[in-house]
C-alpha cells in the first residue's frame, strides 16, 4: 500500500475507534433506517433485507436490497428469506459495493469518525456498550439505523452499505461479479439512499481507497452474495460482532442474535467492521484504485459491515469486542454457530448448514449460508464475532458468497488472512504469506494487519478457528480482526502492532488453524488486499501490483476472491464452490454455488484469473498455511484473521478481502501466485517464492486443506494443500510428490511443525471439510487444476505433510486419501525428511511431529541409487505392511530400533531377500509368528533385545532354508521364560547367543548344550551363570569344550542356587548332557554371565563393507556350479548374465589366479579324479600363487562396463582361440573345451605378469598394452571361472555319491558321529550284483540329488568340502545322469560313461535332456515319500524336505522371499518373466521355495542388475545363492545318509517336523527302504525266523507226545496178555517173540514206537493174535488134562508150531 493509503487506513481505524460510542447510537439510527426501509421484514427476516440484491454488482447492493439504491433511506428489500439470510452477509453485500463507492463511504465514515473526534471504545467498553444496545434494542430497532447515523458512524454506514451491497449481491451473485464496480457505485447509491449525504460524502472523501475498498468489497460481496455466503456473512457478522459481544450476545440469544445481529451490529460492526473496511479501503486509496478491483474486495469489509448491518449493533459490538477481545471469539464462535443455525432456518441458513457439512462443496452451491452454517456453525459464530463476517452473512446468499469474497468488511478484519484468501485463495494465500510478511514489515502501515492480530488477540484466532469447525472460525476472526486492527490502527496502534506481530505470529502459530482459515480467507485477501494494500503495500507493494492486476480482474476476482476466500472457507463454508474453483479455495471462493463457481473460473479470467492465478496460488495459500508457519515471520496473523473471517466461508472470503494486508499479499501472492502455483508443487518453492506462494498452498486447504494445511502447516503449508488435493483427485496424486515437496519446503514444515499442534486440531475440521468438500474438489479441482499448478503443489505439499505427518494430521490426511497415496506421498519426500546418501536412508532424530508412523515407501525414480542400509531408529512405527519393502530389495541392514512394534508376522519382512542385519531392539514386541524370518534366507544377525517377549513358540525360527547363515542372536532384556522352538537350538551356524537378563530355565541351557553344537559364545542370566560357576571345575572336567568365564560377582556370590542339586550331581542329567556334548562336537563353548551395563547391542563394525561370502576362488567356483545348471536349464546366456559379476567376487583375491586356473586345467582334471588330499594341495598352491600376484592385480570394477560387453573386440579375440583349440584337446568334449580356452589365454595373461607384479613398462605403448590386457585378463578370468564351474558340474557327475556323503559328514561337525558309517561301500558290491536293488537306490538318490542340487548341479560334491572341487566327492553323477540310465544299466562303468556323455551334452546344449528331467522327476516322488521332515535330507530326505518346504510355503502363503518380493505386480514384465522361469524350473526343482528363489535370482540378474551401482550387490547375491544351495545340498545328503543307515538317529533328528504329511511319508519311505535295501530289515527277518522255528518246534513236540501216548497204550495191552498166562507165560512168551520176529517186526530191528505204531493197523496180526490166544488156552487145557508122562511131547509140538 502507498503511504497515503496507510494514513487513510490509520484514519479509518482511528475513526472507527472514535466511533466506538457511535455504534451504540448509530445502530439505533441504522435500525431506524432499516425500519424505514423494511421495518417488519427486517425484523422478521433479515434475509429479506439482504435478499433484495438489486445491484449484486454493487457492494452496497445487499444494502440497497434492503434499502433501494435509489432511495438510500429505503433499505427495504424484497421479502426474500434467502436475501434475509444474506442480510447478515448483506454487510458483505454492501461491502462488495463498488470499491469506489464503498471507498468513498469508508472515507466519509473515517472522516465522520475523525470529525467526531470520538475515540473507539475500549474493547471491553465497546463490547459492553454493544451488548447493552443489543439487549436494549430489538432487532427492528437495531436494524433501522439511519443513514445519517451511518454517516456519522463510519462503522455503521459501512455496515449499512455493506448490508445493502450484500443484499444485492446475494440477490444476484453473477451480477455482482459483473457489476462489482457498478455495485461500488450502486453501493454509493444505496448508501446515499440509506445514508446518502454523509456516506457518499465520506466515500468521496477517500474516493481512491473507497473505490478500491468498494471493488474489493464488492468482490468479496459477490462471493458473499451467495445465499450461503450471505448467511455465513450474517453469522460471521454476528461472530464478528460477537467476538467480544457474541460471547455475551450469542450466549444470551444465540439464534435471535443472528437475526438481531445484523441490526445491532450495524453500529458496532460498522464501527468495527467499517473501520477495518474503511481502513482497508481508505488506506489503499491509491493502491485500492490501482487495485481497483482490490478495493472492491476491500469493499467486502464494507460488506462485512453490511453483515453487521443485519445486526449492526451486535456485530459492531461483537466485532469491536472481537477486535478488542479476540479471546471472546471462541465464545462468539459458539453463539455464531447458533446464529448460523438460526440462519439455517431460512433458506440461506440451511445452505450455511450444508456449508458446515461441506464447506468446500457449499461454496460452489449458491446456498453458502447452509454451508457456512454447517462448516462454520463455529465459523459463523466466529464470523459473528468479526463484524466483517457478520456483514458477509448479511449479504444476500448469492451475493453474499460473491460478497463473501468481495465482502472486505469480513476480509478487513483479517486483512492478512483475506490477503491470503483473497488474491486467489491460492495465489492470495501465497501472496498473503508474502504480504503478511510484508505486512509485518509494514506493521506501521499495515497496522490493520497488526490490529487484526490484536483483535484476534492471538487467542481469538484459535477460538475462531476452533469454532470455525476448525480453522475457519479463526480465519474469519482473524480476517475480521485484521480489518478492525486496521480500524483500530489509529485507535490503538500499539494494540494493533502487538496483535499484528504477535497475533500474526500467534495466528500463524495459533493457527495453523487460522492458517486453514487463511486459506479460506485467501480468496478474500484479494479484496482485502485492496483494502489493505496500504499494509501490504509495503509487504507486497510489488506484490500489490500483481494484486492490482488481480484486482483489475478483481471484479471477477471479487467473486473469485470471494470464491477464493470461500474456497478457503469452502473447506469450511462453501465447499461446493470453493472446491470447484480453488480446489479448496475456489470452492470457497464460489460462495454462490453457481455464480461463485462460475465466477471463480471466471475470476481466473477476470481478476479471478489473476485471482485464479492467485487462487491457483491459493493452493499456495494452502501453502500459506504452511507459510502460516512462516507467517509468523510474515504477517500470518493477518492471514489467519482472514482465514478466520472466512470462517463463515463467505465471511471468511470477505474477511480475506477485507484484510487489506491480505489483499496486497493477494496481489503479491497473485504475482507470486503463478509461481506459487508452479511452485505450489514444490511447496518449498512456494514458500521460497514468497511466503505467499507457500502460504497460498496452505491457504488452499483452508477448510479441509486448512486442516491438512495445519498439519501440513507444521510441515509446510503443504498439508493444507494436501487436503485440498485430497479433495481434488489431482491433489491426491500430487500428494505423493508432495512428500518431496514437503521435504523441499522443509522450512514450511518446520514452521508448520511448530504450528502443527493447532493444525492438527484444524486438520480434524479440515478433514471433515475435506471429506465434505471432496465432491466439490472435483470441480474445484478442475478449476484448480486449470488454475492449478497450485493444485499440483498442494498435492506435493500434502504428501510432504503426510510424510511429516507423523502427526494426527498426517493420519487424517491418510484416511482422507488412499493409504497408498499417503504412503506414496510420504515416500515421495522421504529424502527431504530423511537423509539419503552412501546407499543409506537414515530417518533418525526427527521432531516428534515428523517422526514416522509407518515405513515410508519412496516413489520409483525418486532416488537414483539403492539403499543397502535403512535406519528408522527412534520413530513411531507400530506396524509393517506386507508389501512395504518392495522398494528396498537390495537392503542388507535394517534398523528398527526404538519404535512401537508389538508383533511380527510372517509377511513383516517380505521382499528383503538380501537382508543380513536386523535390529528390532527396544520395541514392544510381544509375539513372533511362525515363519517370520523365512523371507530372509541370508540373515546373519538378529537383535531382539529390550522387548517384552515372554516365550519363543514353536516355529519362530523355522524356515525352509534352515537359516543357514544366522550366527548372532540377541534375546537379552526380555521376560523370556519359555523356549519351545527346537529350530532355535538347531540353527546350523549359530555362534553367538545372548540370553542375559532373561528368565530361561535350566532346561533351555541343556537343550542348547545338547543341540547347538556350533555355538561358540553363550551369555546367560547372571543368577544361572553364577550357579554354574560354583561347579566350574566339575563342568570343565567333564566337558573340556565348555569354558566358564566367571566374574568377581559370581565368585563372591553365595546365593543359593536352585539348580544346585541338578548341576552338581555327577550322575545328574546336566552332567550327562555335558558328556554327550563332549562326544558330539569339538567346538569350544564359552559361557559368560551377562554384563550389568551391557547394552545388548552388537555392533557389526565391518558389516557395511564386508567382503563377498566366498573369499576363495575355488570356493566361489564350487558355489557358482550350483546355480549354473539352472541358467542352462532355462536357456539363458550364462556368459552374458554372469561375466559382469564373476570377476567382482574374486578381484579382491587376485586376477592372477587366471593363470593358475589355465595352467592347471589338466591338473584340475586329474585332481578331480584323485584323492582329496591332492585336491587340497592343488588349491593351496593356487591360492599361494594368486596371493603373490594380488599386489599387481588391478580392480576390475572400473572396467565393469567394458567387461560386461561380451561382444567387445578383446573378448571375441579371446574366445576364438578357445573355440578352436577346445576341440583339438578335448576331442569334442565340451566340458573341457572351455578350460582349454583358458589355457589359450594363458599366454595373454602371462604377458601381464610383469605388469601385475608391478614392473613398470618403459614405453607408452607398453603401458597401453597392459591396460588392454588387464581388460582381457578380467574378462578371461571371468570366463575361466565360468568354465571351471561348468567343468566342475560335469566332472562331479562322475563322482561317487558314497564318498561325497562321507565327506559331508566330516565337514559338518554336528554330524561327525555319522562319519564312520560307510555302509554304502559294503553295499556297492551287492548293488552291482543285484541290479534291481541298485537301480532303486540310485534312482532314489538321483532324484534327491537333483532336487537338492537343484538339477544337475554338483552341489553334493561341492558341498562335501565347501570349496573342494573333487568330483569324486560329489555325487553329481546321480544328479545329472538320468534315472533311466541307472535303471537300465547294471554296470556302474557303463552308467558312468553314459553320464559323462549326458553331461557333455548338457554342457553343450545348456539344457538337461527331457528324459533325464522326467526321470528325475519321477524318481523324486519316492524320495519325497521318504523325506524325513528335515529340509535337507539326501535321497528320500529330498522328498521329505520338499514336502516340508512346501508345507512351510503354505504357512507363508507359498511366498518365499522371491515370491513375496516379485509377485506383487503380476503385470510387471519382470514378474511375468519370473513366473515363466518358475514354470520352466518346476520339473527340475520340485521344491517350491527353492524354485522360486532360483527364479527370482535369475530374474534379478537379468533385469535388475544392469546398473553399475548394483554390480557388487548382484555379485554378492549370486555368491550367497550358490553358497546357500551348496549348504542345503550338503545337509540333505547327510540327512539322507542317516536315514538310510541309522533309522533311530534319523527319527531323532527329524523330531522337529510336525507335519503329518512328512511323518506319513517317512513311514512310507522306511517301508520302501526295508523292502529295497538288503539287510535293512534283518532284525525283522530274524524275528520271523525265530517265530517260525518256534512254531516248528511246537509242532514237533506235539507229534512226539502223540506217538508216546500211542506206544504206552500198546505196552499196556501187552502187559494184560502176559498177566493172563502168568503161570505159563514163559514158553508162550518166547514163542510170541519168535513169531513177531518172523513177521519182520523184530523188537530189535525197529524202534519200539514205530513197531507199536503199526500194530493196531494190522488186522491180520490181530487175527493171529486172537488165534494164538485161543490156541494157548486150548493148550493149557490139554496140559492140565493130560497125564504127567505125556506132558513134554505136546509142549514140544506146540513150540514147534509156535516157532514157524
Curated annotation (Swiss-Prot):
Composition skew (Low complexity), residue ranges: 238-249, 358-368, 482-493, 729-749
Pfam families linked: LRR_8, LRRC37, LRRC37AB_C
Give start-end of the signal peptide: 1-35
- From the UniProt record, list the LRR repeat ranges: 137-160, 230-253, 267-290, 864-887, 888-911, 912-935, 937-959, 963-987, 1002-1027, 1124-1146
Q: Where in the cell is it found?
A: Membrane
Main subcellular location? membrane
The record, for InterPro entries, names: Leu-rich_rpt, Leu-rich_rpt_typical-subtyp, LRR_dom_sf, LRRC37, LRRC37_N, LRRC37AB_C
Question: Compositional bias (Polar residues) spans?
Answer: 54-65, 169-189, 223-237, 307-326, 433-446
Q: Where is the composition biased (Acidic residues)?
A: 1689-1700
Q: Quick check: keyword Cell wall biogenesis/degradation in the entry? A: no
Residue ranges, Extracellular side: 36-1582
- Which residues, renumbered to this chain, are glycosylated? 296, 1079
Kindly give the membrane topology term recorded for this protein: Single-pass type I membrane protein
- Ranges in the topological domain labelled Cytoplasmic: 1604-1700
Q: Which GO terms describe its cellular component?
A: membrane
- What cystine pairs are annotated? none
Q: Which residues cross the membrane?
A: 1583-1603
Q: Which UniProt keywords apply?
A: Glycoprotein, Leucine-rich repeat, Membrane, Repeat, Signal, Transmembrane, Transmembrane helix
Residue ranges annotated as compositionally biased, kind Basic and acidic residues, are 1182-1191, 1201-1216, 1675-1685
Give the residue ranges for region: Disordered.
Answer: 54-104, 130-156, 169-534, 559-580, 619-642, 729-752, 1182-1227, 1309-1328, 1675-1700
Family the entry assigns: Belongs to the LRRC37A family.
Instruction: Please identify the protein, giving its name as recorded.
Output: Leucine-rich repeat-containing protein 37A2
> What is the organism of origin for this protein?
Homo sapiens (Human)
Amino acid at each position: 500500500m502507498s503511504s497515503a493509503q496507510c494514513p487513510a487506513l490509520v484514519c479509518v481505524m482511528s475513526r472507527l475507534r472514535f466511533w466506538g460510542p457511535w455504534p451504540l447510537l448509530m445502530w439505533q439510527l441504522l435500525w431506524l433506517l432499516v425500519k424505514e426501509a423494511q421495518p417488519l421484514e427486517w425484523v422478521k427476516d433479515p434475509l429479506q433485507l439482504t435478499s433484495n440484491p438489486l445491484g449484486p454488482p454493487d457492494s452496497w447492493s445487499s444494502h440497497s436490497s434492503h434499502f433501494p439504491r435509489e432511495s438510500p433511506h429505503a433499505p427495504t428489500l424484497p421479502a426474500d428469506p434467502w436475501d434475509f439470510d444474506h442480510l447478515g452477509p448483506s454487510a458483505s453485500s454492501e461491502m462488495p459495493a463498488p470499491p469506489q463507492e464503498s471507498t468513498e463511504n469508508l472515507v466519509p465514515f473515517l472522516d465522520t469518525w475523525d470529525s467526531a473526534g470520538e475515540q473507539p471504545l475500549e474493547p471491553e467498553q465497546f463490547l459492553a456498550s454493544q451488548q447493552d444496545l443489543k439487549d436494549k434494542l430489538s432487532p427492528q430497532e437495531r436494524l433501522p439505523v439511519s443513514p445519517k447515523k451511518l454517516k456519522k458512524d463510519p462503522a455503521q454506514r459501512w455496515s449499512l452499505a455493506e448490508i445493502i451491497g450484500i443484499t444485492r449481491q446475494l440477490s444476484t451473485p453473477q451480477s455482482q461479479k459483473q457489476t462489482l464496480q457498478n455495485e461500488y457505485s450502486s453501493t454509493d447509491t444505496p448508501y446515499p439512499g440509506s445514508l446518502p449525504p454523509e456516506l457518499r460524502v465520506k466515500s468521496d472523501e477517500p474516493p481512491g481507497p473507497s473505490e478500491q475498498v468498494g471493488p474489493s468489497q464488492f468482490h468479496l460481496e459477490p462471493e458473499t452474495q451467495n445465499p450461503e455466503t450471505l448467511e455465513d456473512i450474517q453469522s460471521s457478522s454476528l461472530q464478528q460482532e460477537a467476538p467480544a459481544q457474541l460471547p455475551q450476545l450469542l450466549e444470551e440469544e444465540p439464534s435471535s442474535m443472528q437475526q438481531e445481529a445484523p441490526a445491532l451490529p450495524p453500529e458496532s460492526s460498522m464501527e468495527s467492521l467499517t473501520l477495518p473496511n474503511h481502513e482497508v479501503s481508505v488506506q489503499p486509496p491509491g493502491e485500492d484504485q490501482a487495485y481497483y478491483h482490490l478495493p472492491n474486495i476491500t469493499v467486502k469489509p464494507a460488506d462485512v459491515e453490511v453483515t453487521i448491518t443485519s445486526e449492526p449493533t451486535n456485530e459492531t459490538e461483537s466485532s469491536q469486542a472481537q477486535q478488542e477481545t479476540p479471546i471472546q471469539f471462541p465464545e462468539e464462535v459458539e453463539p455464531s454457530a447458533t446464529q448460523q443455525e438460526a440462519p439455517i432456518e431460512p433458506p440461506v441458513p440451511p445452505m450455511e448448514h450444508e456449508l458446515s457439512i461441506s464447506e468446500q462443496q457449499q461454496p460452489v452451491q449458491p446456498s453458502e449460508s447452509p454451508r457456512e452454517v454447517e462448516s462454520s456453525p463455529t465459523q459463523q459464530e466466529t464470523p459473528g464475532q468479526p463484524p466483517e463476517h457478520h456483514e458477509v452473512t448479511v449479504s444476500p446468499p448469492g451475493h453474499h458468497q460473491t460478497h463473501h469474497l468481495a465482502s472486505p468488511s469480513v476480509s478487513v478484519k483479517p486483512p492478512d488472512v483475506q490477503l491470503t484468501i483473497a488474491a486467489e485463495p491460492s495465489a492470495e494465500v501465497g501472496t498473503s504469506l508474502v504480504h503478511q510478511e510484508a505486512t509485518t514489515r509494514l506493521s506501521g502501515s499495515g497496522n490493520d494487519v497488526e490490529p487484526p492480530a490484536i483483535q484476534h488477540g492471538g487467542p481469538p484466532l484459535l477460538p475462531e478457528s476452533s469454532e470455525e469447525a476448525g480453522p475457519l472460525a479463526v480465519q474469519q476472526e482473524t480476517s475480521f480482526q485484521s480489518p478492525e486492527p486496521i480500524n483500530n490502527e489509529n485507535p490503538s496502534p500499539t494494540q494493533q502492532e502487538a496483535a499484528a506481530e504477535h497475533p500474526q505470529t500467534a495466528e500463524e502459530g495459533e493457527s495453523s488453524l487460522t492458517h486453514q482459515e487463511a486459506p479460506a480467507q485467501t480468496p478474500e485477501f484479494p479484496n482485502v488486499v485492496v483494502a489493505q494494500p496500504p499494509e501490504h503495500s509495503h509487504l507486497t507493494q510489488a506484490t500489490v501490483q500483481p494484486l492490482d492486476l488481480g484486482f483489475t480482474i478483481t471484479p471477477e476476482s471479487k467473486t473469485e476472491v470471494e470464491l477464493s476466500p470461500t474456497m478457503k472457507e469452502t473447506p469450511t463454508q462453501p465447499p461446493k464452490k470453493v472446491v470447484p474453483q480453488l480446489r479448496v479455495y475456489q470452492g470457497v471462493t464460489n460462495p454462490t454455488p453457481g455464480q461463485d463457481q462460475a465466477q471463480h473460473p471466471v475470476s481466473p479470467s477476470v481478476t479471478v484469473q489473476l485471482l485464479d492465478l492467485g487462487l491457483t496460488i491459493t493452493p499456495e495459500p494452502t501453502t500459506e498455511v504452511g507459510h502460516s508457519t512462516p507467517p509468523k515471520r510474515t504477517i500470518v496473523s493477518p492471514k489467519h484473521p482472514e482465514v478466520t473471517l472466512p470462517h463463515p466461508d463467505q465471511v471468511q472470503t470477505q474477511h480475506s478481502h477485507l484484510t487489506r494486508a491480505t489483499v496486497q499479499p493477494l496481489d503479491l501472492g497473485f504475482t507470486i501466485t503463478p509461481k506459487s502455483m508452479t511452485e505450489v508443487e514444490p511447496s518449498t518453492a512456494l514458500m521460497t517464492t514468497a511466503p505467499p506462494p507457500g502460504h497460498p498452498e496452505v491457504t488452499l486447504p483452508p477448510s479441509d486443506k486448512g486442516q491438512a494445511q495445519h498439519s501440513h502447516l507444521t510441515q509446510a503449508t503443504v498439508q493444507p494443500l494436501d487436503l485440498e488435493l485430497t479433495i481434488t483427485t489431482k491433489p491426491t496424486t500430487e500428494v505423493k510428490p508432495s512428500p518431496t515437496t514437503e521435504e523441499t519446503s522443509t522450512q514450511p514444515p518446520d514452521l508448520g511443525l511448530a504450528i502443527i499442534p493447532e493444525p492438527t486440531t484444524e486438520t480434524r475440521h479440515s478433514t471433515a471439510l475435506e471429506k465434505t468438500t471432496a465432491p466439490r474438489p472435483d470441480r474445484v479441482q478442475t478449476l484448480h487444476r486449470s488454475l492449478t499448478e497450485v493444485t499440483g503443489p498442494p498435492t506435493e505439499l500434502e504428501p510432504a505433510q503426510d510424510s511429516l505427518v507423523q502427526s494426527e494430521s498426517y493420519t487424517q490426511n491418510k484416511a482422507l486419501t488412499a493409504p497408498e497415496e499417503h504412503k506414496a506421498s510420504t515416500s515421495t519426500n522421504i529424502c527431504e525428511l530423511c537423509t539419503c546418501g552412501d546407499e543409506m536412508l537414515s530417518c533418525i532424530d526427527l521432531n516428534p511431529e515428523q517422526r514416522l508412523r509407518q515405513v515410508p515407501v519412496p516413489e520409483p525414480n525418486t532416488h537414483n541409487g539403492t539403499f543397502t542400509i535403512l535406519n528408522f531408529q527412534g520413530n513411531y512405527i507400530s506396524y509393517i505392511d506386507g508389501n512395504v519393502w518392495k522398494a528396498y530389495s537390495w537392503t542388507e541392514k535394517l534398523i528398527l530400533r526404538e519404535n512401537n512394534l508389538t508383533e511380527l508376522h510372517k509377511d513383516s519382512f517380505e521382499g528383503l531377500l538380501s537382508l543380513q542385519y536386523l535390529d528390532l531392539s527396544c520395541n514392544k514386541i510381544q509375539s513372533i509368528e511362525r515363519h517370520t524370518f523365512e523371507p530372509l534366507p541370508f540373515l546373519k544377525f538378529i537383535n531382539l533385545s529390550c522387548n517384552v517377549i515372554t516365550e519363543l513358540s514353536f516355529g519362530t525360527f523355522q524356515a525352509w532354508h534352515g537359516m543357514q547363515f544366522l550366527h548372532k542372536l540377541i534375546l537379552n532384556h526380555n521376560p523370556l521364560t519359555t523356549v519351545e522352538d527346537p529350530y532355535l537350538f538347531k540353527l546350523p551356524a549359530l555362534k553367538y547367543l545372548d540370553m542375559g537378563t532373561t528368565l530361561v530355565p535350566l532346561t533351555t541351557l541343556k537343550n542348547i548344550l545338547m543341540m547347538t553344537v556350533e555355538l561358540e559364545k553363550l551369555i546367560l542370566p547372571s543368577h544361572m551363570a553364577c550357579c554354574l560357576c560354583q561347579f566350574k571345575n566339575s563342568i570343565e572336567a567333564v566337558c573340556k569344550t565348555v569354558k566358564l568365564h566367571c566374574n568377581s560377582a559370581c565368585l563372591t556370590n553365595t546365593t543359593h542356587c536352585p539348580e544346585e542339586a541338578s548341576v552338581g550331581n555327577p550322575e545328574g542329567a546336566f552332567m550327562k548332557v555335558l558328556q554327550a556334548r563332549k562326544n558330539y562336537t569339538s567346538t569350544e563353548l564359552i559361557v559368560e554371565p551377562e554384563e550389568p551395563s551391557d547394552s545388548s547391542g552388537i555392533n557389526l563394525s565391518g558389516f557395511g563393507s564386508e567382503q563377498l561370502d566366498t573369499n576363495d576362488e575355488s570356493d566361489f567356483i564350487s558355489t557358482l556350479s550350483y546355480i549354473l545348471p539352472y541358467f542352462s536349464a532355462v536357456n539363458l546366456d550364462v556368459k552374458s548374465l554372469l561375466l559382469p559379476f564373476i570377476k567382482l567376487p574374486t578381484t579382491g583375491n587376485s586376477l592372477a589366479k587366471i593363470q593358475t586356473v589355465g595352467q592347471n586345467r589338466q591338473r584340475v582334471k586329474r585332481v578331480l579324479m584323485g584323492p582329496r588330499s591332492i585336491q587340497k594341495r592343488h588349491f593351496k598352491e593356487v591360492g599361494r600363487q594368486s596371493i603373490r600376484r594380488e599386489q599387481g592385480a588391478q580392480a576390475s570394477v572400473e572396467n565393469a562396463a567394458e567387461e560386461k560387453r561380451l561382444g567387445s573386440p578383446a573378448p571375441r579375440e579371446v574366445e576364438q582361440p578357445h573355440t578352436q583349440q577346445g576341440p583339438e584337446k578335448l576331442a569334442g568334449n565340451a566340458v573341457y573345451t572351455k578350460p582349454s580356452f583358458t589355457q589359450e589365454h594363458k599366454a595373454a595373461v602371462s604377458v601381464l605378469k610383469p605388469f601385475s607384479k608391478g614392473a613398470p613398462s618403459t614405453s607408452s605403448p607398453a603401458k597401453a598394452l597392459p591396460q588392454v590386457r588387464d581388460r582381457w585378463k578380467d574378462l578371461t578370468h571371468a570366463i575361466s571361472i565360468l568354465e571351471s564351474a561348468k567343468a566342475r558340474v560335469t566332472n562331479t557327475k562322475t563322482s561317487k555319491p558314497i564318498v561325497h556323503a562321507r565327506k559331508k559328514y566330516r565337514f559338518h561337525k554336528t554330524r561327525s558321529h555319522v562319519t564312520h558309517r560307510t555302509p554304502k561301500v559294503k553295499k556297492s558290491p551287492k548293488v552291482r550284483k543285484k541290479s534291481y536293488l541298485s537301480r532303486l537306490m540310485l534312482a532314489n538318490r538321483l532324484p534327491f540329488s537333483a532336487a537338492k542340487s537343484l538339477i544337475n548341479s554338483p552341489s553334493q560334491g561341492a558341498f562335501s568340502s565347501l570349496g573342494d572341487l573333487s568330483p569324486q566327492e560329489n555325487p553329481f553323477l546321480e544328479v545329472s545322469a538320468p534315472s533311466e540310465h541307472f535303471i537300465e544299466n547294471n554296470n556302474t562303468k557303463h552308467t558312468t560313461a553314459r553320464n559323462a556323455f549326458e553331461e557333455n551334452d548338457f554342457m553343450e546344449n545348456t539344457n538337461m535332456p527331457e528324459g533325464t528331467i522326467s526321470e528325475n522327476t519321477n524318481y523324486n516322488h519316492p524320495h519325497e515319500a521318504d523325506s524325513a521332515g528335515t529340509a535337507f535330507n539326501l535321497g528320500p530326505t529330498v522328498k521329505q524336505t520338499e514336502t516340508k518346504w512346501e508345507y512351510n510355503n503354505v504357512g507363508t502363503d507359498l511366498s518365499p522371499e522371491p515370491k513375496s518380493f516379485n509377485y506383487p505386480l503380476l503385470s510387471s514384465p519382470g514378474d511375468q518373466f519370473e513366473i515363466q522361469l518358475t514354470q520352466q524350473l518346476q520339473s527340475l526343482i520340485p521344491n517350491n521355495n527353492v524354485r522360486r528363489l532360483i527364479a527370482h535370482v535369475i530374474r534379478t540378474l537379468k533385469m535388475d542388475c544392469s546398473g553399475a551401482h548394483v554390480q557388487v550387490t548382484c555379485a554378492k547375491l549370486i555368491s550367497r545363492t550358490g553358497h546357500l544351495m551348496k549348504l542345503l545340498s550338503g545337509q540333505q545328503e547327510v540327512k539322507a545318509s542317516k536315514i538310510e543307515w541309522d533309522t533311530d538317529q534319523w527319527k531323532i533328528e527329524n523330531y522337529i517336523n510336525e507335519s503329518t504329511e512328512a511323518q506319513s511319508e517317512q513311514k512310507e519311505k522306511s517301508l520302501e527302504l526295508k523292502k529295497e535295501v538288503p539287510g535293512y530289515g534283518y532284525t525283522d527277518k530274524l524275528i520271523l525266523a525265530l517265530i517260525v522255528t518256534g512254531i516248528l518246534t511246537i509242532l514237533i513236540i506235539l507229534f512226539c507226545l502223540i506217538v508216546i501216548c500211542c506206544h504206552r497204550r500198546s505196552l499196556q495191552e501187552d502187559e494184560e496178555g502176559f498177566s493172563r498166562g502168568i503161570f505159563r507165560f514163559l514158553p508162550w512168551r518166547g514163542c510170541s517173540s519168535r513169531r513177531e520176529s518172523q513177521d519182520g517186526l523184530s523188537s530189535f530191528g525197529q524202534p519200539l514206537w514205530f513197531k507199536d505204531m503199526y500194530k493196531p493197523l494190522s488186522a491180520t496180526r490181530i487175527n493171529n493174535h486172537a488165534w494164538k490166544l485161543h490156541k494157548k488156552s486150548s493148550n493149557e487145557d490139554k496140559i492140565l488134562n493130560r497125564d504127567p508122562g505125556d506132558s513134554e511131547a505136546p509142549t514140544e509140538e506146540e513150540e514147534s508150531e509156535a516157532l514157524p
